[in-house]
UniProtKB/Swiss-Prot annotation:
UniProt organism field: Gibberella zeae (strain ATCC MYA-4620 / CBS 123657 / FGSC 9075 / NRRL 31084 / PH-1) (Wheat head blight fungus)
Gene3D superfamilies: MFS general substrate transporter like domains (1.20.1250.20)
Protein task: MFS-type transporter; part of the gene cluster that mediates the biosynthesis of butenolide, a mycotoxin that shows antibiotic activity but does not seem to play a major role in the spread of head blight in wheat.
InterPro entries in alphabetical order: MFS, MFS_trans_sf, Proton-linked_MCT
Protein name stated in the entry: MFS-type transporter
Superkingdom field: Eukaryota
Pfam families: MFS_1
UniProt key word Transport: yes
Keywords: Glycoprotein, Membrane, Transmembrane, Transmembrane helix, Transport
Residue numbers spanned by region Disordered: 1-47
Main location: membrane
Keyword Cell cycle: no
Compartment annotation: Membrane
Length: 441
């Protein structure tokens, strides 16, 4: 595009922004309508309307896609490692769950600290630290032969690295969009589907032939290439804030933010249960039982169909609002989890996997869109998102080990854990309803 034409286009976009802001995502406060009391005085005068498209915006979205691919995509592949580690290490499923749960916990827990650093203008440093930690974790895991070694490498080191990478995938991408914010975040979060399909397929093909060590190294090479691209290409749009607290406690004075955070705590207690346990369930409970390879196919399907849930949910979230869609989605997830109790044949297992994959993908994608909707101050958006991640981290740390402990206590029967997680979804839905009722439009 010629320079003059590009300038005219930008000018038109800015002139029309105030009119367009009225039709933004329902239930969200338009960025341009924020008063000086709601936006930091240090940066308010420098913030221009989100471009809602363009090269930099979509490049940032692609970077967010790669970040989710190498963080949540790898985490969502843990089901295949859960199965392998249970056999290889001869440990109970609840013990193995701690490896994945610690990784997920740290991915969320460090969010509050990372969010403030991003707001302060240190995006490149945050991305570099995250990349280094993830690569150290994956390559040291490839050399691990003991349970405690995998806890340190795949659990702690990869988890810390993920924590540096997950928050910017949401907070930075969201600043480039207004009307299409939910769609852009949805495209970014679809990276977790890409990663799950890629890493599950790699592990499925390489574990029997190349062995565990080279399987992990091959995954590490893919992560290195894509994460280095992100470190170079991803840029923040907003000027750095010159001041601010590490934790914005004022956020919890907003009832909608507080109720949303509590609700997603209960939802995240339950949402990964299906991702971790559908494979062992298919080998232990249904009749006839599935083979190891067939059970891994369920994981591929579970993650693959998630792309439909993510894209459809975020497309309509821009029309109806993320909270409005999140409420029925979490309620349907509760019904799906309770219905899992009745799954007792391979056909039922495949049907349930497709259905839950779509619903679970929708929840994981609408969640960050919902946070962005509730965050009214652009200068502290990273901190608000990070704090939410930190609270939810404790749910992800304990959810699957609790489920594993219930299964072990019931001599390998799953219905107790399924009922517990279905109930957790119901409680979470109730708090999201409360958040919607208290949301200030």
């Amino acid at each position: 595009m010629p320079p003059q034409q590009e300038q005219d286009t930008d000018s038109d976009a800015i002139r029309s922004y105030n009119e367009e802001s009225k039709s933004e995502t329902p239930g969200c406060i338009p960025d341009a309508m924020l008063s000086s009391d709601e936006t930091s005085n240090d940066v308010a005068s420098d913030i221009s309307p989100p471009p809602d498209g363009g090269w930099n915006a979509w490049l940032c979205t692609l970077c967010g896609h790669f970040l989710f691919m190498n963080t949540w995509g790898f985490i969502n592949s843990f089901g295949i490692f859960q199965t392998y580690y249970t056999t290889f290490l001869d440990r109970d499923p609840s013990d193995i769950s701690w490896i994945g749960s610690i990784q997920v916990f740290l991915s969320f827990f460090v969010g509050a600290f990372v969010g403030r650093y991003i707001d302060s203008g240190h995006l490149r440093l945050v991305l570099s630290c995250g990349t280094i930690l993830v690569l150290i974790g994956i390559f040291t895991a490839s050399l691990s032969t003991q349970y405690w070694q995998l806890i340190l490498s795949q659990g702690i080191c990869c988890g810390l690295g993920n924590g540096f990478l997950v928050t910017p995938a949401v907070s930075v991408t969201s600043t480039y969009f207004a009307k299409r914010r939910s769609l852009a975040i949805g495209i970014s979060t679809c990276g977790s589907v890409t990663g799950a399909l890629v890493f599950n397929s790699m592990a499925r093909q390489l574990l029997p032939t190349a062995g565990f060590g080279w399987t992990m190294r091959a995954i590490g090479f893919v992560q290195a290439a894509t994460l280095l691209f992100v470190v170079v290409a991803m840029k923040t749009r907003l000027p750095p804030t010159k001041s601010g607290r590490l934790v914005e406690w004022v956020a919890f004075k907003q009832l909608d933010y507080t109720f949303f955070t509590i609700g997603m705590f209960f939802n995240f207690w339950a949402v990964f249960f299906g991702y971790y346990y559908i494979a062992p369930y298919s080998r232990d409970i249904i009749t006839p039982t599935l083979t190891y390879t067939q059970s891994l196919n369920l994981l591929l399907i579970l993650n693959g169909v998630g792309v439909f849930g993510r894209m459809i949910a975020n497309h309509y979230a821009d029309t109806f609002g993320p909270l409005e869609l999140l409420i029925p989605t979490c309620l349907v997830a509760a019904v799906a989890t309770f219905s899992w109790i009745a799954v007792d044949t391979p056909t039922h297992a495949y049907v349930w996997t497709v259905f839950y994959g779509i619903i679970g993908g929708s929840i994981l994608s609408l969640f960050p869109a919902g946070i962005s909707c509730l965050t009214t101050d652009l200068s502290t958006r990273g901190a608000y998102i990070g704090m939410n991640f930190t609270v939810i981290s404790f749910a992800t740390l304990t959810g699957n080990p609790i489920a594993g402990a219930i299964i072990t206590a019931m001599q390998g029967r799953y219905y107790g854990a399924q009922a517990f997680m279905g109930s957790s979804f119901i409680v979470g839905t109730a708090f999201i309803v409360a958040a919607k009722m208290n949301h200030v439009k």
